Amino acid sequence: MIKSKMISFYIAVMMIWTCTVKAQDDNKSLIHKIGFDVRPSYVAPTSKFLKDDGYGNGLTLRKAASFHLKYGFQQNPNSKEGQLYPHTYQGIGISYNTFGNRQEVGNPWAAYVFQSSRIAKISSRLSFDYEWNFGASFGWHPYDENNNYRNKIIGSKINAYINLGFFLNAKLSRYCNLLVGADLTHYSNGNTHLPNAGLNTIGGRIGLVYTLNPIEESHHEI
């Protein structure tokens, strides 16, 4: 009788322990997201090279565009971190950038880390959010006193990439969100190579974020 009760007790303890471990593991599961952005922009005329109307071969440097592919992860809403930062996610991204003047400037790629979160809730399906990007851009055609002497804004093939955006985040479904807003971008090398006037853009952005494994917050009754 006592032995039978002890066995039942141990079985109950093991079941509780197993459920607890499973719940803890479930709470550690991350939410994974894939995003795609298109960002048309205007190039700020901050130097003579950008202000001139003549660009040698009829090329202009007024408009720019970038195309972004991103992977992000978010904390489980049932974890401690997820409850502290319920709308924050971060990750890595790559982008292809064009300025309409490949000959003198190039069409660089960028690789970066990013973070996004909510600023204000507007409704149950709409919020006002921000996102920052920080990384490096590659593939520029830098200044060369013989072959690319007009380009005095970019002095190196690799430059820092910095971006800050604000946008409306609309929840289309459990899996998909639409992002529409505006952003600012800066490219430069921090004076590691001269000349380094840098390049700045301001523009719009539209994108989609797809959540691969949405996890709902658990509401426990007391």
Feature map (PLM): residue ranges:
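Short glycine/proline- and aromatic-enriched beta-strand/turn motifs that initiate or cap beta-hairpins
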Residues: 24-74, 213, 222
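Residues that define the transmembrane beta-barrel architecture of outer-membrane proteins
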Residues: 30-32, 61-67, 105-111, 126, ...
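Repeated loop/turn-to-beta-strand initiation elements of outer-membrane beta-barrel proteins
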Residues: 44, 78-80, 170, 174-178, ...
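Membrane-embedded beta-strand positions of outer-membrane beta-barrel proteins
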Residues: 34-38, 90-92, 130-134, 166, ...
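Bacterial Sec-dependent N-terminal signal peptides
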Residues: 1-36, 126-128, 170, 174-176, ...
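Gram-negative (and chloroplast) outer-membrane scaffold detector with strong preference
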Residues: 85-138
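Transmembrane beta-strands of outer-membrane beta-barrel pores
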Residues: 38-44, 73-75, 94-100, 134-142, ...
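Extracellular loop and loop/strand-boundary signature of outer-membrane beta-barrel proteins
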Residues: 53-57, 99-102, 148-154, 189-196
